[in-house]
Design a protein with these regions (language model features):
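N-terminal secretory signal peptides that target proteins for export/translocation
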Residues: 1-10
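Bacterial N-terminal signal peptides
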Residues: 15-26
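N-terminal export/targeting and maturation segments
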Residues: 27-87
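Structured domain cores in non-transmembrane regions
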Residues: 62-148
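Acidic, small-residue rich beta-repeat scaffolds with periodic aromatic anchors
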Residues: 109-239
Length: 239
C-alpha cells in the first residue's frame, strides 16, 4: 500500500529541513574564529627631513581571510640611523588593570634621543592612564627602555607635529607590504580628530575624542562608573 504524501507531511518535512538549516547556521556562527596577524613596513619622515623604516606587527583576535579582527597587541621595530633597533610594544587587553592600550602616531629623534607620541585607544585605556589632557601619552627612549615624560619635557619643536606613521592599522583587505611617506600621509588624511594625529600643546575642550569618555574605575571583574551601586553589583557578579 502506498503512503500518500499529504500536504501536511510535506509541510512537516519542510519545517524539519528549516530547523536543521537554522541549527547548522547557528552552530557555524559559534565556531571560534582563529587568531590572525598582519604586518607591514613603513617609511617614517623625521623632523629634520631624514627617514627611517619601521616594521609593524599586529596580533588579531578572530577574522577569517581578509576580515579585520580585534587587535590583541602590536610590536613596532624602529630601525634607527645609527643601525640600532628599538622596539615599542602595546597590549590592548581591557581585562588587566595595568595601564595599556596605547596607539602610537608620531616617532622622532631629537639630539640622538628617540621620542614617541601615543593616544589611549578607547575609554578604558583613557581612564587607565588617569585621563590626561591633552589626551596623549608621551615617551622618550633612555637607558634601553621607554620612559613616560610630561608635555613640558617634550622638545618644543615637536609640539604640533603631525602623525608620521599610519594611525591605527590598515584594512586587511587593502594591506600593502610597504608604505612610503606619501602613502602614510594618504592613509592619515581622513582623520579629523586632532589628538589622533597632532601632538597637542593645549588641553582639548569638547570634541568627540576620548576626553568625552565618562569616568570609570576598575572592579574585580570589569569596569564601570564609580559609586556604591556599581561596587555592589560587581561584588555580586564577580565570583
Amino acid at each position: 500500500m502506498k503512503t500518500q504524501n499529504t500536504p501536511f507531511k510535506q509541510i512537516a518535512k519542510l519545517g524539519l529541513l528549516l530547523l536543521l538549516t537554522v541549527a547548522i547556521v547557528a552552530c557555524a556562527a559559534y565556531i571560534p574564529k582563529p587568531n590572525t596577524s598582519m604586518s607591514w613596513k613603513e617609511e617614517v619622515l623625521l623632523h629634520d627631513g631624514s627617514k627611517i623604516i619601521s616594521h609593524r606587527f599586529y596580533n588579531l583576535y578572530g577574522g577569517y581571510d581578509t576580515q579585520q579582527g580585534a587587535v590583541i597587541d602590536e610590536t613596532v621595530t624602529f630601525n634607527l640611523p645609527n643601525g640600532k633597533r628599538i622596539v615599542w610594544k602595546s597590549n590592548y587587553s581591557d581585562s588587566v588593570a595595568e595601564p595599556n592600550g596605547l596607539s602610537h602616531f608620531y616617532f622622532d629623534i631629537i639630539n640622538g634621543v628617540p621620542y614617541l607620541a601615543t593616544y589611549p585607544a578607547g575609554c578604558i585605556a583613557y581612564n587607565k592612564w588617569d585621563r590626561p589632557n591633552p589626551p596623549q601619552v608621551l615617551f622618550k627612549y633612555m637607558d634601553n627602555q621607554w620612559q613616560r615624560i610630561t608635555l613640558a619635557e617634550l622638545p618644543s619643536e615637536l609640539i604640533n607635529a603631525q602623525a608620521n606613521v599610519i594611525v591605527g592599522n590598515p584594512d586587511r583587505s587593502l594591506l600593502k607590504p610597504y608604505y612610503d611617506v606619501t602613502a602614510v600621509n594618504t592613509k592619515n588624511a581622513p582623520i579629523s580628530t586632532p589628538e589622533y594625529k597632532t601632538i597637542l600643546g593645549e588641553p582639548v575642550k569638547g570634541g568627540g575624542g576620548v576626553t568625552s569618555c565618562e569616568v570609570i574605575v576598575r572592579y574585580k571583574c570589569g569596569w564601570g562608573g564609580p559609586g556604591e551601586f556599581n561596587r555592589k553589583y560587581f561584588e555580586r557578579v564577580c565570583k
